[in-house]
């Protein structure tokens, strides 16, 4: 719609040049007292002036509608961004707790001198609710789609940033729910990297939502 508005504004500029041409003809005819030239100039000025005004008003109208739609999308984007951040933080909190539980069980299993039977880290991971985490990610999925639909490209964060934040959180989930594939030291290192990364994503989104970015 902004393209259409710009086209009509461009046409109004061209038409205005025609108006000037007819106005000059009208003026020359008036000065030289040439009724023919004066009549043509006057008629042409009126017609081309009307066309110019019409093009100008249509162009402004289209640009006004486009600006309104863009503003509405940006407001919706901001509203969804706040929902995304709230759900993102809740998911981080849940994953941090689960990840810490795996870490504690695994480190105890490897390094404790306690004679009691240790709890295997995989048993801890297997005890986590898949449904709970799926619910978190389903909500984030829906927010991602809404952000994509309302992304004007004019705000300081785009849909793509939220998608990267989501992907990083999904990696954290996979590590926490399937920890043994990396070995304990790999698990600890990866966990720290994921935890720091998702926390940084969350902080930047919060600054954006607070208007401080």
Residue ranges and their predicted role:
Residues 28-33, 59-79:
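Transmembrane signal-anchor/signal-peptide helices with a preference for the extracytoplasmic
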Residues 77-127, 161-213:
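C-terminal amphipathic alpha-helix
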Residues 3-7, 37-40, 44, 155:
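Membrane-interfacial loop-to-transmembrane-helix junctions in polytopic alpha-helical membrane proteins
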Residues 121-163, 210-213:
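Short, solvent-exposed, charged loop/turn and helix-capping segments
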Residues 1-33:
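Membrane-embedded alpha-helical segments of integral membrane proteins
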Residues 48-63:
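Hydrophobic membrane-insertion alpha-helices, especially the h-region
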Residues 12, 19, 45, 52, ...:
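Heptad-repeat amphipathic alpha-helical coiled-coil interaction surface used
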């Amino acid at each position: 719609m902004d393209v259409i508005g710009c086209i009509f504004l461009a046409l109004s500029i061209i038409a205005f040049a025609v108006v000037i041409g007819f106005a000059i003809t009208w003026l020359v005819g008036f000065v030289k007292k040439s009724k023919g030239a004066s009549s043509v100039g006057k008629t042409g000025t009126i017609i081309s002036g009307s066309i110019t005004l019409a093009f100008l008003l249509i162009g402004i109208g289209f640009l006004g509608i486009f600006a309104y739609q863009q503003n509405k999308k940006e407001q919706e984007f901001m509203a969804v961004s706040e929902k995304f951040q709230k759900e993102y933080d809740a998911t981080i909190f849940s994953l941090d707790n689960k990840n810490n539980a795996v870490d504690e069980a695994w480190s105890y299993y490897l390094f404790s001198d306690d004679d009691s039977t240790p709890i295997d880290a995989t048993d801890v991971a297997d005890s986590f609710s898949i449904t709970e985490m799926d619910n978190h990610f389903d909500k984030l999925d829906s927010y991602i789609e809404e952000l994509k639909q309302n992304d004007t490209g004019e705000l300081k964060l785009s849909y793509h940033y939220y998608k990267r934040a989501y992907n990083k959180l999904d990696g954290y989930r996979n590590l926490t729910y399937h920890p043994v594939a990396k070995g304990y030291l790999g698990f600890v290192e990866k966990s720290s990297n994921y935890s720091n990364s998702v926390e940084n994503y969350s902080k930047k989104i919060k600054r954006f939502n607070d208007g401080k970015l």
